[in-house]
């Protein structure tokens, strides 16, 4: 509950400063439930509650992002890193919005990290899959779960820079123009560990990978890339 005070206080202040704005308590309609030992979005319940909360839309709606409540206990929970973008996406999907705008501190997705590649430039359009891949592999423009709710409803996402509002930004949508360039962008993840389990005794043995991934999952380790030799004598 303590970590949610920043969003709750700041959104209330902004609501007071904007004429015609109404503050909504996201704890009343963003609900989570425990799945695999983690608090994850209770999608169906949340979508129904969002529709009920926004039956009458005011001129401006202010909603604190990131925070939620457990569907069963009512205890305050949160949506994790990037939860504010995720909150906006959840609401946009539930209300069948025409598009979702996310204002951040960059001009959009870049072809590469400008701190590493000085000639990197903003990508005008990306598909949902392309954006998800770049996010999963290090591009910290959008929190990956943000993409899924609007992707299902085919709602475009527009990424804009708060400090450069005139910038074109990046549009994420399903139908993008054909691009002659085979590579849209390059992203990377630092601090990655590669583990290889190998041995001739693995060949033809059923359930080896299940045991490997179960051991990692039981220790809270997420695997994002897998490679297995065709001879089945190693998994990385």
Label each residue range with its predicted role.
Residues 1-143, 147:
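Nucleotide/pyrophosphate-binding catalytic subdomain
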Residues 24, 63-65, 103, 144, ...:
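Generic beta-strand/beta-sheet core signal
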Residues 67-68, 84, 96, 107-108, ...:
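Short, glycine-/Ser/Thr-/acidic-enriched flexible segments
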Residues 99-101, 156-159, 164-165:
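Internal nucleotide-binding/catalytic subdomain
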Residues 142-144, 153, 163-170:
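Surface-exposed amphipathic alpha-helical tracts and adjacent flexible/coil segments at the periphery
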Residues 168-236:
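A conserved regulatory-domain signal marking ACT and ACT-like small-molecule sensing domains
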């Amino acid at each position: 509950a303590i970590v949610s005070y920043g969003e709750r206080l700041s959104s209330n202040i902004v609501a007071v400063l904007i004429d015609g704005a109404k503050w909504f308590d996201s704890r009343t309609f963003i609900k989570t439930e425990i799945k695999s030992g983690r608090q994850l979005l209770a999608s169906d319940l949340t979508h129904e509650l969002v529709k009920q909360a926004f039956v009458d839309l005011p001129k401006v709606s202010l909603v604190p992002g990131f925070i939620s409540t457990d569907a069963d206990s009512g205890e305050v929970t949160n949506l994790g890193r990037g939860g504010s973008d995720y909150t906006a996406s959840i609401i946009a999907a539930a209300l069948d919005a025409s598009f979702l705008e996310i204002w951040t501190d960059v001009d959009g997705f870049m072809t590469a990290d400008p701190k590493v590649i000085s000639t990197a430039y903003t990508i005008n359009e990306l598909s949902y899959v392309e954006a998800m891949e770049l996010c999963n592999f290090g591009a910290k423009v959008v929190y990956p779960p943000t993409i899924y709710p609007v992707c299902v409803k085919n709602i475009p996402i527009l990424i804009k820079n708060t400090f450069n509002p005139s910038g074109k930004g990046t549009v994420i949508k399903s139908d993008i123009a054909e691009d002659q360039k085979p590579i849209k962008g390059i992203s990377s993840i630092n601090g990655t560990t590669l583990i290889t389990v190998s041995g001739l005794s693995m060949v033809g043995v059923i359930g080896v990978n299940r045991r490997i991934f179960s051991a990692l999952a039981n220790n809270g380790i997420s695997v994002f890339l897998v490679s297995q030799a065709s001879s089945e004598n190693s998994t990385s």
